[in-house]
Regions:
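Structural micro-motif
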Residues: 103, 114, 121, 125-126, ...
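Short active-site neighborhood of thiol/selenol oxidoreductases, capturing the structured segment around
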Residues: 29-59, 74-76
Length: 185
């Protein structure tokens, strides 16, 4: 495990790639919808049997830490848009007791989603018929600031961590701390 500088200021990794998808309420949501907000991006799918339930339980904890914060949001982007329709995402959101109006479960064009994940965010997603669930992806969360820049801590060697581990308590706690930092910037 890399040791991460607990008090490090957040560095800027780069601009968030542009995206535009449809959320669980059938509204068009783009990166511009989050202008002026601090937000977190993840890639998941509703029928994921392994890491997604852990990721979204942790994301719910993050949501609950910022329930009254109108300048905070979450973009949960499905990598199985053929199955994860607006209706399916709406039901899924209920399962996780999504009450923060800025938590958007997003679906859209398959190729756009895969390009966004693999090239835009450098977060691997892929179809993998041999694995349970049929898709592969990482458990990482990406933090974006009010100006649309990807932000992160640095490790003890001064290298950016870039992503937060959405499967580990430590990663989630760091993310909550860093969201607070950005909201106060």
């Amino acid at each position: 495990r890399k040791s991460i500088d607990k008090d490090s200021k957040l560095i800027t990794i780069g601009e968030v790639p542009a995206f535009q998808f449809i959320n669980q309420n059938n509204d068009t949501i783009s990166n511009r919808s989050f202008a002026g907000k601090v937000y977190v991006v993840e890639f998941f799918f509703t029928t994921c049997p392994s890491i997604c339930p852990i990721m979204n339980q942790n994301m719910k904890e993050i949501q609950n830490a910022f329930l009254d914060e109108k300048n905070f949001g979450i973009a949960s982007i499905t990598i199985n848009p053929l199955y994860d329709t607006v209706e399916v995402l709406k039901e899924y959101a209920k399962t996780y007791e999504v009450v923060q109006p800025n938590w958007h479960f997003l679906t859209g064009n398959h190729n756009e989603i895969y390009t966004l994940a693999n090239e835009g965010f450098n977060l691997y997603v892929g179809e993998a018929p041999e694995v349970e669930g049929g898709f592969e992806h990482s458990g990482f969360f990406t933090l974006i600031d009010q100006n649309g820049n990807i932000r992160s801590r640095i490790d003890a060697n001064g290298n950016p961590i870039i992503y937060y581990d959405g499967l580990e308590k430590e990663g989630v706690e760091m993310l909550i701390t860093d969201i607070k930092k950005l909201l106060n910037e």
